[in-house]
């Protein structure tokens, strides 16, 4: 694979090659950070579970807090409408 890439190296000038390498390096560092953060979040949820909290509900609360209040109210109203239409509420 490296042999295939070598003939194309001259397609990009040295500045572009440097920029490309920098971008790739940054993305790779961010991917590592993302993995580390995901592990930390997992640990927080495990701590919450250990303290008796329902992790599924906590995740839902976090997700809901990310949503705009008006958008959430609109979704709730539509959900209630649908549930009412099928006799669930």
UniProtKB/Swiss-Prot annotation:
Q: Which domain of life is it from?
A: Bacteria
The entry lists its GO molecular-function terms as: DNA binding
**Per its UniProt record, what InterPro entries does this chain match?**
GapR-like (IPR018753), GapR-like_DNA-bd (IPR046367)
Record-linked NCBIfam families: PRK13694.1 (NF010247)
Q: Which family does it belong to?
A: Belongs to the UPF0335 family.
Name of the protein this chain belongs to = UPF0335 protein Caul_0876
């Amino acid at each position: 694979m490296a042999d295939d890439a070598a003939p194309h190296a001259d397609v990009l000038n040295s500045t572009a090659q440097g920029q490309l390498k920098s971008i790739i390096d940054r993305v790779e560092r961010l991917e590592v950070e993302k993995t580390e953060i995901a592990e930390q979040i997992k640990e927080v949820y495990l701590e919450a579970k250990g303290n008796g909290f329902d992790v599924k509900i906590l995740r839902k609360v976090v997700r809901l807090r990310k949503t705009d209040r008006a958008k959430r109210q609109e979704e709730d109203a539509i959900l209630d409408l649908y549930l009412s239409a099928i006799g669930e509420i």
